[in-house]
Amino acid sequence: MVMTDPIADFLTRIRNGNMRKFDVVEAPASKIKRQIAEILKAEGYVKDVEYVEDNKQGVIRVFLKYGKNGEKVITNLKRISKPGLRVYVKSDDIPKVLNGLGTAIISTSTGVVTDKVARETNVGGEVIAYIW
């Protein structure tokens, strides 16, 4: 079976693992998935990210994070730009997720960055996902 949107699959694996309170979620690796996982780690949504090389494309292990009483750190993940409907924004139209409480992941000409970094560097791009 051909996967038409591997980024949506990656985000769905994280979302489903978070809902079931899994400690680790695994997904096939790619460059953009690695960058998204590193942003999730840098923003404090996940504990750690690990890359496992195999003879194929490799695997990304995302270690999910929960609060002291088991509450979820990630409330929701939403894919915005899809293969059938791409969503692009200019540097002055970059959205704020939940008035700044969430994070938008944007693919720019300088790489995959958060909405805050894109605003600071004054670059626009494709809105990949919202996380809050």
From Swiss-Prot:
> Which controlled-vocabulary keywords does the entry list?
Ribonucleoprotein, Ribosomal protein, RNA-binding, rRNA-binding
For molecular function, the Gene Ontology terms on record are: rRNA binding; structural constituent of ribosome
Q: Name one GO biological process term.
A: translation
The UniProt entry, under SUPFAM superfamilies, shows: Ribosomal protein S8
Q: In this entry, which stretches build a coiled coil? A: none
The UniProt entry's GO CC annotations, sorted and at most eight, read: ribonucleoprotein complex; ribosome
The signal peptide annotation in the UniProt record is none
Function in brief? One of the primary rRNA binding proteins, it binds directly to 16S rRNA central domain where it helps coordinate assembly of the platform of the 30S subunit.
What the record says about family reads: Belongs to the universal ribosomal protein uS8 family.
- Subunit comment: Part of the 30S ribosomal subunit. Contacts proteins S5 and S12.
Protein's UniProt name: Small ribosomal subunit protein uS8
Q: Which organism is it from?
A: Lactococcus lactis subsp. lactis (strain IL1403) (Streptococcus lactis)
